[in-house]
Amino acid sequence: MAKRDYYEVLGVARDVSEQDLKKAYRKVAMKFHPDRNPDDASAEEKFKEASEAYEVLSDKQKRAAYDQFGHAGVEGQGGMGGGAEGFGSFSDIFGDVFGDIFGGAGGGRGRGGPSRGADLRYTLDLSLEDAVRGTSVKIKVPTLVSCTNCGGSGAKPGTTATTCNTCGGHGQVRMQQGFFSVQQTCPTCRGQGKTISDPCNKCHGHGRVEETKTLSVKVPAGVDTGDRIRLAGEGEAGADGGPSGDLYVQVHVKDHEFFQREGRNLYCEVPISIFDACLGGDLEVPTLDGRVKLKVPAETQTGKLFRLRGKGVTPIRGGAAGDLLCRVIVETPVNLSNKQKELLEQLKDTFKGTQHSPKQQSWFEGMKNFFGDMKM
């Protein structure tokens, strides 16, 4: 049975953030965990499926491979093993889920301190030629960078931030509500764990400023629409000295004047005259490497495909290049003179009593049989 899409398994969109991905997995894992569904084979299978999906999507490299190549991109890279032990007991999941809310369910974690910057996405439009051959391009990306004036601290040069007196630097405080000790974001430092009495006049205490960066992107040969190129560390700068996020360049290949691409093969239509179709001849057809000659045999019908081997696309992961398939389209002459029409009438008379249109003859016979079957 074919595997379900991993994003569908966890009920998330393809651009889901790491945090929302984790929340979605916890929700599914808690619902179908074997500890909550003893002797339920269906629930156990769904738990295994969710664990496998989360293992791939929570790993940046595996997720990038899956986004680009689907299940084939992550085959043979291990897995959770399919058992409940792949994540841990239900109590582990429960404690991890509610540890951020209830102080006693896992100790809680402060939110102050360095945090990773957000990932960014950029859509890159490419010509078919550049996508097939590979290229290097410059792109401009608006982002957040560490403030050079304060070194990312947010404090005015010569001063420093101080530990928040309310939360003690944890970024969160606990409040007693009935039987539970509820953990909330510190209202004084807003979760940062520190306060700045004299903020930087450039970043106004944020530690980061907006900037447009110019980046060089090396596009490998063979990319296609939907492929992604990851530039590690080129996303937004992290807060409080945290690591930068990544930039994902999404490839979009523009329509081409002559060619359509399907996988590693290219297709094009080649118009030919009725005379070349009848008598045969040599035609020049375009390829991505220049013009080549195509020999058209006599009595060629419109729509016939001719294959030029090796004139397609070399796959991004290597292997033999695909083919160029040329579909000939026989054109009917237009703007005929009286003399030309007269000559065609004479030619038409020479065809009487003989069969020169096999498809037309079989079509008429089929129509005759069709209407014959409809007799009342």
UniProtKB/Swiss-Prot annotation:
A zinc finger (CR-type) spans 134-212. Gene3D superfamilies: DnaJ domain, Heat shock protein DnaJ, cysteine-rich domain, Urease metallochaperone UreE, N-terminal domain. It comes from the Bacteria. It is found in: Cytoplasm. InterPro entries: DnaJ, DnaJ_C, DnaJ_domain, DnaJ_domain_CS, HSP40/DnaJ_pept-bd, HSP_DnaJ_Cys-rich_dom, HSP_DnaJ_Cys-rich_dom_sf, J_dom_sf. Belongs to the DnaJ family. Homodimer. This is Chaperone protein DnaJ. It comes from Teredinibacter turnerae (strain ATCC 39867 / T7901). The lineage of its organism: Bacteria, Pseudomonadati, Pseudomonadota, Gammaproteobacteria, Cellvibrionales. The gene is dnaJ.
